[in-house]
């Protein structure tokens, strides 16, 4: 990051504003005694931004609910990169995530962080592009941006906290286009089920940002049916993620209770597909 200490005012609304709640959760969790993610980049970035962080409703106590997801997708991405020394990574809806810096992929990996132009304009002040790291200003559902990405190697498409803000039609169109364009690769993303979409008013960061979630996915069969060429690798409830055992006890107790009802257990899911 740049050494300038002047704070930068941020003024996002809707879905882009929700990325600030995610960022703040990662920053707070970096100070935990036993952090799940340990994202010191997020901590530094929060100190550089002028924003009312109380609006996010994220606290040190509930921050692990954010970082368990980020840590899980870091792990899946590392697995992909470990067997694909030459690959393309499309980090769609990247927000202000420092994943490229956390993972530090090898020289054979071309990494693209993709998000709305106003998000990328802010992002490039802290994470400037380099030889193998590129920033792309685009709505991920306006698929012309994919034409600028070479399709000569395996691709990892990673969408954390993205799909639920897309419509079903635009989300499926994105997944289909990736499968059609690239020779092989993986899709890694999280989803909310339909109950999660119907009860989104209870999601404080989403409500306060004035964001709207649209696309609910009850299980991987829906994705496999609508995106030809995919093969399911893993689909799991967030409660079954490896890192969940490290969250505070009260969250583990809540998970045991919610897991008695399938629709509650599967409200938040992590999906991984190959093609």
Identify the meaning behind each predicted range:
Residues 245-275:
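Core SAM-dependent methyltransferase catalytic element
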Residues 210-240:
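Short alpha-helix
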Residues 156, 175-194:
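Conserved beta-strand signature within the Rossmann-like core of class I S-adenosyl-L-methionine
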Residues 135, 165-178, 182-183:
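A short, conserved alpha-helix within the catalytic core of class I
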Residues 154-170:
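A short SAM/SAH-binding and catalytic strip from SAM-dependent methyltransferases
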Residues 1-90, 94-136, 151-152:
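Rossmann-like AdoMet
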Residues 143-153:
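Short amphipathic alpha-helix with an adjacent loop that forms part of the alpha/beta core around
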Residues 194-211:
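Short, glycine-/aromatic-enriched active-site segment of Class I SAM-dependent methyltransferases
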């Amino acid at each position: 990051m740049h050494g300038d200490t002047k704070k930068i005012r941020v003024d996002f609304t809707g879905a882009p504003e929700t990325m600030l709640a995610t960022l703040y959760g990662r920053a707070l969790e970096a100070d935990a005694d036993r952090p799940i993610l340990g994202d010191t980049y997020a901590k530094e970035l929060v100190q550089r931004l002028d924003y009312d962080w109380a609006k996010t409703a994220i606290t040190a106590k509930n921050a692990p609910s954010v970082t368990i997801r980020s840590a899980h997708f870091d792990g899946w991405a590392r697995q992909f990169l470990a067997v694909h020394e030459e690959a393309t990574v499309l980090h769609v809806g990247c927000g202000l995530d420092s994943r490229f810096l956390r993972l530090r992929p090898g020289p054979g990996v071309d990494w693209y962080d993709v998000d709305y132009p106003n998000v990328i304009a802010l992002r490039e002040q802290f994470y400037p592009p380099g030889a193998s790291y590129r920033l792309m200003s685009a709505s991920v559902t306006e698929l012309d941006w994919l034409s600028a990405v070479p399709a000569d190697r395996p691709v990892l498409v990673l969408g954390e906290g993205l799909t639920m803000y897309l419509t079903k039609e635009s989300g499926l169109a994105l997944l289909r286009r990736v499968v059609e364009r690239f020779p092989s690769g993986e899709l890694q993303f999280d989803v909310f089920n339909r109950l999660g979409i119907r009860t989104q008013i209870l999601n404080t960061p989403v409500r306060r940002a004035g964001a709207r979630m649209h696309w609910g996915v009850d299980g991987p069969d829906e994705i496999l049916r609508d995106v030809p060429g995919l093969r399911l690798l893993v689909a799991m409830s967030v409660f079954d993620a490896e890192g969940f055992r490290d969250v505070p006890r009260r969250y583990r107790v809540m998970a045991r209770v919610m897991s008695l009802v399938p629709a509650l257990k599967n409200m938040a899911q992590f999906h991984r597909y190959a093609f």
